[in-house]
């Protein structure tokens, strides 16, 4: 469930599972499950490591897919006999590149500001992008200054303090069912 939730919520996740040795995969038994087939519908990508010299590339691609475009879950299946094999020296699977911060074009910001100021009853629906962008403080200041109510998704729960007068809590929480009416 956690992997499927991460994928549907757009949260980057790399799940690594253990597996029987490759020499036992052809034998029908209670210890072997085709995990790559199981994870296929709930991940962006799933791969089994069958040779130690491919570990670096498989791990690198798992993280790349998990973090790219719409983030989500990926899966790596590791048979026990392959996990025990030495990985070639110098294999460094992850080279994290820090992307330069991107900002919206001034015209886009001005257009958005115009729409907000012209709106009769604006409301902000805050999602996981606020969390990933580390923008909770800025969102709270923006909403408070402009007196705009904020509803957050489950993945952004708490990005605006619940005691803030403009917090309309989390959409989908039964105790506070007024979010759907506001939207």
Task: Name each model feature, range by range.
Residues 1-183:
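N-terminal alpha/beta PP-like core and its mobile active-site loop of ThDP/TPP-dependent enzymes
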